[in-house]
Amino acid sequence: MSKYVDRVIAEVEKKYADEPEFVQTVEEVLSSLGPVVDAHPEYEEVALLERMVIPERVIEFRVPWEDDNGKVHVNTGYRVQFNGAIGPYKGGLRFAPSVNLSIMKFLGFEQAFKDSLTTLPMGGAKGGSDFDPNGKSDREVMRFCQAFMTELYRHIGPDIDVPAGDLGVGAREIGYMYGQYRKIVGGFYNGVLTGKARSFGGSLVRPEATGYGSVYYVEAVMKHENDTLVGKTVALAGFGNVAWGAAKKLAELGAKAVTLSGPDGYIYDPEGITTEEKINYMLEMRASGRNKVQDYADKFGVQFFPGEKPWGQKVDIIMPCATQNDVDLEQAKKIVANNVKYYIEVANMPTTNEALRFLMQQPNMVVAPSKAVNAGGVLVSGFEMSQNSERLSWTAEEVDSKLHQVMTDIHDGSAAAAERYGLGYNLVAGANIVGFQKIADAMMAQGIAW
């Protein structure tokens, strides 16, 4: 590894020892950039990496709101505007009790590289709050969203920072936040948020985008390996929008998802989650707020494994779609023992660094990184921004076609970058290199301003 890269990683580990998720993602990204950094000694001369691992701006604020009983609660809100060298900040808002500064910085850092990979002019950001929408009434969620936007509005704009949804933030929450934004600023600037309802500027295919895009990426991997999706079995984790979109597109292309997981365990459906009834039931489960994947097992009479993860099932493809660090070294060893060939990260950083290194050492396994695989979500968000700017609405076929093409290009570009630096078919390193190079070029061209 490059001495410069080693030094910056060591500095980050020391300075941010209390931010483990952020340190983990910095280590994962920078550790693959040695060949690029060594080829450009000018990067060290202008402290490029040191600047790149520090956000351009971190906004932290209190969010007071009142519940239905008149009791006042206070949550913490965040917006980490990590890197805007190539365009307005772009990235989701997450409402979950687990939200903290380390997770926001990790997601913002990853987002910068992901947005760069899309080829669209978007910088990287992430935000959210430790507010838990589960168990709250619709009015309570509305009041919280309004309180959150009452502070956030001053930091965002169509050409400044364009938030979107993420875990705990769907079209409902985006709608409430946009309503408050419109009231405060006094104008119809619908390009300020993406993930909106169709009635006021949302894009077709946005709910399915991350899942669809992940499968299009797998399709490109299959083409490279002279293989096909037809007949493949897939283990999915999660049962939200991403897993739903993936299951839907897998079925359409002739493969079948056979697992889903939740906080309570996982289900195994050997016949596959391929029918319209089963795929639509995933949406019903999520909308119920019960957060139990066992409901699927009860309805369709399949096996449920309480408190377990699906990584011990023998399948062709693994696609973790749930949350960060879902696959540790122990789980990775189970995956390898089952001779799984394709390990496709879909959730943000779903694999511990230790497990990722182990999987990448397997000679017969293809490992694909989340920042490339799940780029479809932010890609269609970028398409939504374009439609809002043009005052036009694209057809579903047009959006899907563009999504398919760009996801294929992301795979092909990553593979080519890895080959160019003598790394073989290393999609993890290739994605990091491509994402980094565009940001680095922009930062170098703009001088030492950030």
Curated annotation (Swiss-Prot):
It catalyses: L-glutamate + NAD(+) + H2O = 2-oxoglutarate + NH4(+) + NADH + H(+). One of its GO terms (cellular component) is cytosol. The record marks 166 as: Important for catalysis. The keyword NAD applies. SMART domains: ELFV_dehydrog (SM00839). GO terms for molecular function: glutamate dehydrogenase (NAD+) activity; glutamate dehydrogenase (NADP+) activity. Substrate binds at residues 90, 111, 114, 165, 381. The active site is at 126 (proton donor). Changing residue 381 to V: Dramatic reduction in the dehydrogenase activity with glutamate as the substrate. GO terms for biological process: amino acid metabolic process; glutamate biosynthetic process; glutamate catabolic process via 2-hydroxyglutarate. Pathway: Amino-acid degradation; L-glutamate degradation via hydroxyglutarate pathway; crotonoyl-CoA from L-glutamate: step 1/5. NAD(+) binds at residues 210, 241. It is an enzyme of class 1 (oxidoreductase). InterPro entries: Aminoacid_DH-like_N_sf, Glu/Leu/Phe/Val/Trp_DH, Glu/Leu/Phe/Val/Trp_DH_C, Glu/Leu/Phe/Val/Trp_DH_dimer, Glu/Leu/Phe/Val_DH_AS, Glu_DH, Glu_Leu_Phe_Val_DH, NAD(P)-bd_dom_sf. It comes from the Bacteria. The keyword NAD applies. Keywords: NAD, Oxidoreductase. Homohexamer. Belongs to the Glu/Leu/Phe/Val dehydrogenases family. This is NAD-specific glutamate dehydrogenase. It comes from Clostridium symbiosum (Bacteroides symbiosus).
